[in-house]
């Protein structure tokens, strides 16, 4: 039996701010239980729902040094979906109204968490063969493991993997502060270790000291070795390219299933979508005050409204796009200027554009089901889960060829009759517009071709079991079997 510990700052269903929670919470249950004992460790935030906190059972507590402090470390545990979750408790660090705050407070909080992850292992009597760390919040786990923990035989031979979900977030602050917070010696603050451009960098420490580095799609693994996508760490990632690989994320096919989804007004599957899918569109048009036209092409957008997601392109061509016979439904929150942009177009083209400036899981499912196409023109996209959800619901993605979007959406080829969506390659508003208009043409003039594409999209398998097989293979390679 191989023991694997996921160290993460968030995991569904306990706490979620982004895609990292989906990976850490959903992936573990898809491993082969005969060969892998997967457990997850995360902080016990005060902002978790009370129903989860009530189910956690206290294991023990102890005190641990961190820099110049002596910190309380409480351990709680519970089982969910057959997976054991451990929670690190410390009210000083984890009592805020949300999981993340601002540097340097977050850095101290996750330096504490990284050290606590290692400190609790002998206490809970679980010795992992591999500690799988996720994003900068756990970047110091491989560093601490390499440092003082080597004095204890228990930790000898434990391997670490660093998974980068988004390279943009690295956990950076000045060296003096990080040295004080972490209690690490000067040895670690050189340009070949934790120092990057005169600052201390948590993620860099993780990448340098981990035994293997992964990211969440093949294309993104290649892209981050270039200056444009590398966020200042491209040189290091090129140096580590032998142990860097991309494994595409999946989605939970039980949660996202148009045949059983309770949020939909009409459920459907790959054989019934031609008749049933449109009923969701009619209902959504009614509920959102759009013109009720079952034949109108509806384009869905469900996203954080930020620069990364390509909303400057959408802003640029929105007036032109609204001259076409399309309807646009957007759901999400984010930068104020993009929120206001969608509010403006909702007002200007009322009946064609609907801006839902909030986030609601049930509404997102309804948009995936009701839309004909799903727009996702990201500037960069490590993996992206929305396009996988839209494929699952038979809604064809229109994407920019970057990161996970390039790996998961096969562009339509009308001569070969292949493809599961539409794509464009340059970050250019009119290139995006012409791709949308090409999709409109297929939708209105070649409906049979469109439906065949929906068939292919719904037949794709991006469930977690696919990703789990690739992770298992990597664990075996790292353990040496």
Residue ranges of model-derived segments:
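Catalytic cores of nucleotide-sugar-dependent glycosyltransferases that transfer UDP/GDP/TDP-activated
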Residues: 1-481
């Amino acid at each position: 039996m191989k023991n694997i510990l996921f160290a993460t700052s968030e995991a569904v269903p306990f706490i979620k701010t982004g895609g990292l929670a989906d990976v850490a919470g959903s992936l573990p249950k898809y491993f082969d239980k005969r060969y892998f004992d997967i457990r997850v460790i995360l902080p016990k935030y005060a902002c978790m729902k009370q129903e989860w906190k009530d189910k956690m059972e206290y294991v023990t507590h102890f005190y641990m040094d961190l820099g110049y402090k002596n910190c309380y470390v409480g351990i709680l545990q519970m089982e969910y979906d057959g997976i054991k979750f451990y929670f690190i408790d410390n009210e000083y660090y984890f009592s805020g109204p949300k999981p993340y705050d601002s540097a340097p407070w977050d850095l101290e909080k996750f330096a504490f968490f990284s050290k606590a992850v290692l400190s609790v292992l002998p206490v809970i009597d679980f010795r992992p063969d591999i500690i799988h760390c996720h994003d900068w919040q756990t970047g110091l786990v491989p560093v601490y493991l390499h440092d003082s923990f080597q004095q204890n035989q228990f930790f000898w031979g434990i391997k670490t993997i660093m998974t980068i979900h988004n390279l943009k977030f690295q956990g950076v602050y000045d060296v003096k502060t990080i040295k004080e917070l972490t209690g690490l010696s000067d040895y670690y603050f050189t340009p070949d270790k934790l120092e990057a451009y005169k600052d201390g960098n948590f993620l860099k420490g993780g990448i340098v000291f981990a035994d293997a580095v992964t990211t969440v799609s093949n294309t993104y693994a290649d892209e981050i070795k270039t200056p444009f996508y590398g966020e200042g760490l491209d040189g290091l990632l090129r140096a580590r390219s032998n142990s860097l690989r991309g494994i595409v994320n999946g989605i939970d096919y039980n949660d996202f299933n148009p045949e059983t989804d309770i949020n939909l007004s009409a459920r459907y599957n790959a054989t019934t979508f031609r008749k049933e899918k449109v009923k969701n569109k009619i209902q959504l048009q009614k509920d959102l005050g759009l013109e009720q036209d079952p034949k109108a092409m509806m384009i869905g957008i469900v996203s954080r409204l930020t620069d990364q997601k390509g909303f400057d392109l959408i802003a640029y061509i929105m007036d032109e796009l609204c001259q076409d016979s399309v309807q646009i439904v957007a759901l999400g929150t984010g930068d104020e200027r993009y929120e206001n942009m969608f509010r403006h177009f909702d007002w200007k083209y009322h009946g064609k554009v609907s801006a839902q400036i909030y986030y609601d899981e049930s509404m997102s499912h309804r948009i995936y089901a009701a839309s004909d196409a799903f727009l996702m023109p990201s500037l960069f996209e490590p993996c992206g889960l929305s396009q996988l959800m839209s494929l699952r619901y038979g809604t064809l993605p229109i994407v920019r060829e970057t990161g996970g979007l390039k790996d998961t959406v096969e562009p339509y080829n009308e001569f070969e009759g292949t493809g599961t969506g539409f794509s464009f390659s340059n970050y250019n508003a009119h290139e995006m517009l012409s791709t949308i208009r090409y999709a409109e043409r297929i939708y209105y003039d070649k409906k049979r071709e469109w439906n065949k594409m929906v068939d292919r999209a719904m037949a794709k398998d991006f469930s977690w079991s696919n990703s789990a097989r690739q992770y298992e293979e990597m664990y075996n390679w790292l353990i040496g079997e």
